[in-house]
């Protein structure tokens, strides 16, 4: 992960190799926000620290006993979506609150790139609308766990 920090700081293009063969190449921004190859995806997941964070998050009581009106979600976003207060907006529009359990934002090639793990809470209809709104705004949203 230390080496990846150096790559993020000084490079604008990156190539990923496995067993002496090129498996993926692109801009640092593209590789970190949309890795295509499974090995690259695993590498980026490790380099961003989300794997380690998820181990700790899944041990939290609030996650283990997730309320029925809640979902645990992983949000990834880049570029202009960071220009708006998306978490505040879903609360104002849909009365869906977000409990931020993990967040990270970096600047890659002068573009803000972020990810969060949140518990979104609200009534079922509003929760679905808020999720759709986030996705329409350009947020990649993956529900990791639904409330029981």
List PLM regions with ranges.
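Catalytic metal- and UDP-sugar-binding loop of GT-A-like glycosyltransferases, i.e.
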Residues: 17
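ABC ATPase nucleotide-binding domains
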Residues: 45-121, 128, 143-148
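Short amphipathic alpha-helices in soluble, non-transmembrane regions
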Residues: 89, 129-138
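A short, surface-exposed alpha-helical micro-motif characterized by mixed small hydrophobic
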Residues: 7-11
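Short acidic-hydrophobic catalytic motif
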Residues: 29-33
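Short, glycine/charged-rich "phosphate-handling" switch motifs in NTP-dependent
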Residues: 13, 25
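H-loop/switch region of ABC-family ATPase nucleotide-binding domains
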Residues: 1-2
């Amino acid at each position: 992960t230390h080496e990846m920090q150096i790559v993020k700081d000084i490079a604008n293009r990156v190539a990923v190799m496995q067993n002496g063969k090129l498996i993926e190449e692109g801009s640092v921004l593209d590789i970190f926000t949309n890795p295509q190859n499974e090995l690259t995806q695993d590498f980026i997941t490790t380099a961003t620290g989300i794997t380690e964070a998820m181990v700790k998050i899944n041990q939290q009581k609030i996650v283990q006993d997730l309320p029925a009106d809640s979902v645990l979600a992983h949000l990834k976003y880049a570029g202009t979506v960071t220009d708006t207060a998306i978490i505040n907006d879903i609360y104002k529009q849909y009365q869906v609150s977000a409990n931020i359990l993990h967040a990270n934002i970096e600047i890659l090639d002068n573009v803000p790139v972020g990810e969060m793990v949140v518990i979104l809470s609200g009534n079922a209809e509003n929760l679905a609308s808020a999720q759709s709104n986030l996705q329409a705004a350009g947020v990649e949203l993956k529900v990791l766990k639904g409330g029981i």
